[in-house]
Amino acid sequence: MSIDLEKNHNRIYSMNINSMNRDPEFYLKKAKYFYSKSQENVDSDSTDSDNEKNNSTKNVSRNIPKNIPKSISKNIPKNVPRNIPKSIPKNVSKNIPKNVPKNVSKNIPKNIPKNVPNKSRNKYSNYSEDSNYSEDSDYSSDESNSINTVYSDEVDSESIYSDYSDDNDQNNVQNNVQNNVENEDDYDYEYVKMEPVDLAQLIEEHTDLRSKIKPKYTRFYDPVTRHYYSIDKLFEHEDVLLNKRPTTGVWYPEIQNQNNIMKDPKTGQLFRVKKIYNPKGKYHYEINSVKRQTKRKPGTTYYTVTYEDLDPLD
């Protein structure tokens, strides 16, 4: 049975949900097989780890020495310094020099460049190399004299770096500014008279900006003929007076001699209508009957007839 399951191992990845519903026993067997296999692996791992622990404890127990003193921990001191000096002078505080300047920090200049070498550090390093100074040596009066010399060197450094003090910097800046000031006589001034701005005119200029025709608007609607017209024929005829339309206050573009088809709802007869304009802006229709039957196509429109007087140029 296990051999058959191993052969069908790849079958899981190729089957759909519908196939799982058809053959549920196969998946139960498959799950039991993998569960038992995982339990075997867990048991084998646990036995190996237990054997390793037992072997390690046996080896440790063999290497333990037999003659171990019991009171070792009592004889170990807790706070033991590693480097204990042999001879420590008792009167160390008496050898400190008395005449030490108190205000040493105030005499140090503030604006010292970083790349300038420090003479006092060099003296300390040379002193330690020449005399082979060690912590075990006694304090003497010679060392106190050297300390005094160090303080005197630091005080002398003020004269070396006096150019970098704050007072000198401020004086130099003031002198440079005074030297760089140019005379007013060197320039020629022109006086311009400023006129007041007309706000009403500015507002009109901004509000009267009319939006331009965008390319996506490719046709316009004529409410008189109830038809859409293309943008290519805009302002084609000069005879049309745009501001004197009798029907509407807004002008919509259309072609002057365009043929439109109109259907009479009573008789069902078709007419071809021409809309003709006058130079004054008025227009009239020319109606001609059409014998053929037109087909409905996208773009063709049908208009109902209004039975009124069609006398042109009333």
Swiss-Prot record:
Biased composition (Polar residues): 56-76
Disordered: region residues: 39-146
Bias-annotated ranges (Acidic residues): 132-141
Domain of life: Viruses
Bias-annotated ranges (Low complexity): 88-131
Protein's name in the database: Uncharacterized protein L609
Organism: Acanthamoeba polyphaga mimivirus (APMV)
